[in-house]
Amino acid sequence: MKDKKILIIGGSGFIGSAVSSILKKNNFITILDQKKPKIDNVKFIKGNFFNSTKIDRLIKKNQIIIVFAAISNINFANKNTVKTIEQNTLAITQILEKIRVCKEKKKIFFPSSIYLHGKNSDIYTISKLASELIIISLCKKYKINYTIARLPTIYGTFNRAEDVISIFVKKASKNKKIMIHGTGKQQRNFMHSEDVANAINHLLNKNYNNKVISLLSDQTLNILNLAKKIVKIIKSKSKIKKLNKAKRYDDFNFSSNRDIKEGSKLIWKSKNTIEKNIKLMTKS
C-alpha cells in the first residue's frame, strides 16, 4: 500500500505509535490525539473524536480511518462503565456516521481483542464486541469497507507500562514479590508492538476488506510461566505469590487457537521475542 492518506485516531498511543511508524514510510499520515506523537514526518492535529468540526474535516480528507483511541485499561474500564461505552463504542458509531456522508469511498480499520473468544465478560470486552457488531452492521448497510483485527496481548516499543510483562519486569528488577491472581495457568498470546504494526500493514495491503481477523503470534505462555521466565532472565530474587485460588471473574484465558474459526485468523511469526524484550527493558 502506497500514497494513501491515512487518519490515525489515537496515533500517539502505544499501538498507534508503532503503526504510525510503519505506515508513514509509504503513506501520508495524520494523527489525531490529545498528545503530540514521539515520531516525526507525520501531521499532528490536537483533539479527539468528540471534536466534531475537526473530525468531519479530517475524515473527508483521508481515505483510511484507523481508530486506536479507546479506554484499554481493564481495571479503569470496569470502574468507569459509562465513559468506556462512550469512548469505545459510541465514538465508533459517530465516526461511521461521518464516513457515511462522505462523497468519496472510505475504509475503517478497527482493532479489537482476541479475548472476545473467551467465556468471561467484562465491560472492556463487551464494548469491543458491541463496536464490532455496530461496524459490521452499519458498514454493510452503507457499503463502507472495513477490517476488524482482534489483537492479542501486546508489549514492546512505546509501551504504556500497564501490561503484564512491564508490571512483572518492574517488580523483578526491584526484587519485589510478583503477585498472580488464581493458579497462574491463564494463558496469553503475546505479540510485540512492531510485529503488530507490520501485521496491520499487511492487513491493510492485502484483500481483507469486510473481514474480522484474529491476529495471533507464535508466542503463547501462561501467567505463571511468564513470571518464572522474567525472574530467570533478570536473575531476580523475587518470589512469585498466588493471591488466591480463584482467578478474577473478568480474567481472560487464551487456551487454544481451536476456539477461533478457520479462515479468520492470521498467525504472525514473531521477529521480536519476549526474551529479547525483557533484556532490553532491563537495560533501559
Predicted regions located by residue number:
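N-terminal Rossmann NAD(P)H-binding glycine-rich loop of SDR-like oxidoreductase domains
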Residues: 6-25
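SDR active-site strand-loop-helix element
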Residues: 9, 32, 65-69, 108-114, ...
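Rossmann-fold cofactor-recognition segment
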Residues: 38-51
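NAD(P)H-binding glycine-rich loop region in Rossmannoid oxidoreductase-like domains
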Residues: 49-86
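Conserved Rossmann-fold NAD(P)-dependent oxidoreductase catalytic core, especially the SDR/UDP-sugar
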Residues: 67, 90-124
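Conserved beta-loop-beta element that borders a ligand/cofactor-binding pocket
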Residues: 112-113, 133-157
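Active-site helix of classical SDR
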Residues: 127-130
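C-terminal substrate-binding subdomain of Rossmann-fold SDR/epimerase-dehydratase oxidoreductases
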Residues: 172-284
